[in-house]
């Protein structure tokens, strides 16, 4: 397929909704993660050794999240995509109120690591589903969207830190997660409506 043919997918409004949803969701996760080490030291008051251990736990949990997401996306993709932003919002709220408790934050980071591993699969699935006829280009768009989300959210979360302190960095994550809900549900509604029409 020629480059010109692949670029035509950019005229699809559904692709743009999907890209915005992915930008927001990835931003929610990695905007906060960008400041996690500092958060663990200054808010949770973990020692340097425990910060390293906690970050390792986060990374290993990503692997488990990938496995879980693979199964759920193959079984009940729309339900999983729909509930994910709410789960992440709840986790950030728990982190907001209990993040200053050392061992509690390690448990929160474990669960968050699993969710972040899931998000990588959700993001790629969401864009690929809309642009399934141009898989290579869809993968490139996925990488662009996730990187843009990380950059924008890290900047926004930095503003929250400047204004409200490092302990409120998760407010930036909550903002991005809540905004993503509308875009994901617009996509889910479109897909569900299309499937209902096909079944008639």
Region spans (language model):
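Juxtamembrane intracellular "pre-TM" segments in multi-pass secondary transporters
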Residues: 1-19
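Extracytoplasmic gate region of multi-pass secondary transporters
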Residues: 14-56, 60, 77
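Juxtamembrane helix-start elements in MFS-like secondary transporters
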Residues: 46-55, 101, 105, 135-139
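Residue-level signature of mid-helix packing/kink "hotspots" within the transmembrane helices
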Residues: 59-67, 150-151
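Helix-to-loop junctions at the C-terminal end of transmembrane segments
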Residues: 64-77, 161-162
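C-terminal transmembrane helical hairpin of 12-TM major facilitator-type secondary transporters
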Residues: 77-123
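A late C-terminal transmembrane helix in Major Facilitator Superfamily
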Residues: 129-168, 172-176
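Multi-pass alpha-helical transporter architecture, strongest
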Residues: 174-200
